Amino acid sequence: MEWEIVIGLETHVQLATESKIFSGSSTRFGAAPNTQANEVDLALPGSLPVMNRGAAERAILFGLAIGAKIAPRSVFARKNYFYPDLPKGYQISQYELPVVVGGTLSFFVGEEEKTINLTRAHLEEDAGKSLHDEFHLANGAPASGIDLNRAGTPLLEIVTEPEMRSAAEAVAYARALHGLVVWLGICDGNMQEGSFRCDANVSVRPRGQVEFGTRAEIKNVNSFRFLERAIQYEVRRQIELIEDGGKVVQETRLYDAERDETRSMRSKEDAHDYRYFPDPDLPTLVIGQDWVEAVRATMPELPSAMRARFEADFGLPAYDAAQLTISRKLAAYFEAVARALPAGQAKLAANWIMGEVTATLNREEKDIADTPVQAAQLAALINRIIDGTISNKIARDVFAAMWAGENGGEPDAIIEARGLKQISDTGTISAMIDEVLAANPAIVAEYRAGKEKAFNSLVGQIMKAARGKANPQQVNDLLKAKLSA
């Protein structure tokens, strides 16, 4: 039987505010346990929540960026459940009237563009954190501790429709969403610190079946690699279970990265299990059109708009434009390089940034903001390729030297110091070709007998004689002319 995978994602995005969503406590990460929790976070009797305007504005900004409807009236609700790190015995969230409704997000899976519909995005408070490894009782027995520093940190929970059909598609969506919230400045995107956490709802069904299968939710996956592996494992588990005559149980599961498997955590609740009702301590959040427009005025150029501009202004393919707008810093870096080159050479800049620059950043686990090669320096290097001073191959060696800080990272100084200027003098190259042809009559005969590979062998020997500095195009042209004579 052929199976179809159905995936929907719920992503918890910690909003980059200085204080918590309903209290004045700091949201700074890494403080000593329970030093950033006041009476509201601790749910002490008589304490009342006060809405953080900045959290609402960040939610509005996100809604505008995805083309969603901003609800003119939004209500906070109590989501009732017990957990040790939830002091109130309920979480303040949103249910029937979220702040953001609908919207879409487009992204690339390989070179294929996809668009996913979003159901909603709602504001809520984060819970505290249970710590299980650091504590022991006086008799040595294991114990757990509770850190409430995170309790009350503002979250935007972003929910998709169940429209993704592969783990690769889910990861591509998650990367695009991560890029967007960081681009907008509403989240720092630090997955190791829990700023961006994904829950994946996964089910399978026979291909062609309309009804959804029973889903399992995989909780709090904090890396893109783990998200892909968790979904892949869960899909295999469900298919094997069904094909062996079993039934998938609706439940919440955790991904164990060390064992590369998901395991059951608890039965999956439905909405009615949480007994949602409007929070009587918080008034309705009223969002007037003037407030929406004020937030819209702060919006940066969006990735989608910048992609379209890069395609129109620089003639880039859609895939290149998408890759170069993964982050604002990368997009700004590319644009600075492209505008420092002659007209029509932006594609060369794109190739270098998506190739050599990105590969080096990945190898050294750095962000584009940390590159030692500035945009002006990369543009100067590419200009030396364009004007024929060096070949593309030699340019890669120069780039490595620039990255290492040689000669201040200036390409012209490195080229001069290393004597790397390309040989473009026709007479000099012609003499080298004559020497190679005279020394290799057998290879010349093979080429003239129709063996095309012999040509590449001759080119290789000429470039070796020139120590890689001969202009490759001139070598090809002159060699072909001499062999045809």
From Swiss-Prot:
GO terms for biological process: glutaminyl-tRNAGln biosynthesis via transamidation; translation. Keywords: ATP-binding, Ligase, Nucleotide-binding, Protein biosynthesis. It comes from the Bacteria. Its EC number is 6.3.5.-. Disulfide bonds: none annotated. One of its GO terms (molecular function) is asparaginyl-tRNA synthase (glutamine-hydrolyzing) activity. It catalyses: L-glutamyl-tRNA(Gln) + L-glutamine + ATP + H2O = L-glutaminyl-tRNA(Gln) + L-glutamate + ADP + phosphate + H(+); L-aspartyl-tRNA(Asn) + L-glutamine + ATP + H2O = L-asparaginyl-tRNA(Asn) + L-glutamate + ADP + phosphate + 2 H(+). It is an enzyme of class 6 (ligase). Pfam families: GatB_N, GatB_Yqey. Allows the formation of correctly charged Asn-tRNA(Asn) or Gln-tRNA(Gln) through the transamidation of misacylated Asp-tRNA(Asn) or Glu-tRNA(Gln) in organisms which lack either or both of asparaginyl-tRNA or glutaminyl-tRNA synthetases. The reaction takes place in the presence of glutamine and ATP through an activated phospho-Asp-tRNA(Asn) or phospho-Glu-tRNA(Gln). HAMAP family: GatB (MF_00121). Belongs to the GatB/GatE family. GatB subfamily. Heterotrimer of A, B and C subunits. NCBIfam families: gatB, PRK05477.1-2, PRK05477.1-4, PRK05477.1-5. This is Aspartyl/glutamyl-tRNA(Asn/Gln) amidotransferase subunit B. It comes from Bordetella avium (strain 197N). The lineage of its organism: Bacteria, Pseudomonadati, Pseudomonadota, Betaproteobacteria, Burkholderiales.
